Regions:
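Acidic beta-to-alpha connecting loop that harbors the catalytic carboxylate
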Residues: 56-59, 83-85
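Short, conserved loop/helix-junction motifs that constitute active-site signature segments
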Residues: 44-47, 71-73
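Catalytic active-site module of serine/aspartate enzymes centered on a nucleophile-bearing elbow/loop
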Residues: 82-109
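Hydrophobic, well-ordered secondary-structure elements that form the walls
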Residues: 46, 76, 101
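Conserved beta-strand scaffold positions in the cores of enzyme catalytic domains, especially
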Residues: 78-80
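Conserved loop-alpha-helix segment in the C-terminal half of the alpha/beta-hydrolase fold
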Residues: 57-76
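Alpha/beta-hydrolase
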Residues: 1-44, 60
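Short beta-strand/loop motif that positions the catalytic acidic residue
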Residues: 46-47, 52-55
Length: 109
């Protein structure tokens, strides 16, 4: 199993992230929403509202957030969580940067 599939399997197919209503895989139409809505075409319209991008140091998806950060207008911030993978930031309370989230929302809400 490739590393990305292993990470998601270790979360969604095991007790940690399992849900009884899950079919355990993507459907043929799972990606249709992404294909029909080009997310990055509108990222600059978020400004002047601030954006906080949180990425795991070892997340396979970090490139997506880094690209989104580059495309976003100010104000923006990119925050990296050391030692975190993609799914670690779902439920690993020892890695989720609660202090950063609190300071961001306190300052910007």
């Amino acid at each position: 199993m490739d590393p990305i599939s292993r990470e998601f399997f270790g979360y969604y197919a095991m007790k940690r992230g399992f849900h009884p209503n899950s079919i355990g895989a993507f459907t043929k139409t799972s990606a249709m929403a992404f294909m029909n809505f080009p997310l990055m075409n509108y990222i600059q319209t978020i400004s002047p509202r601030p954006i906080l991008f949180i990425i795991g140091e070892h997340a396979h998806s970090r490139y997506f957030s880094e690209d989104a950060y580059k495309m976003a207008a100010e104000p923006k911030e990119l925050f990296e969580v050391a030692s975190a993978g993609h799914v670690d930031l779902y439920d690993r309370t020892d890695l989720i940067p609660f202090d950063k989230l609190e300071s961001f929302f306190t300052e910007n809400l």
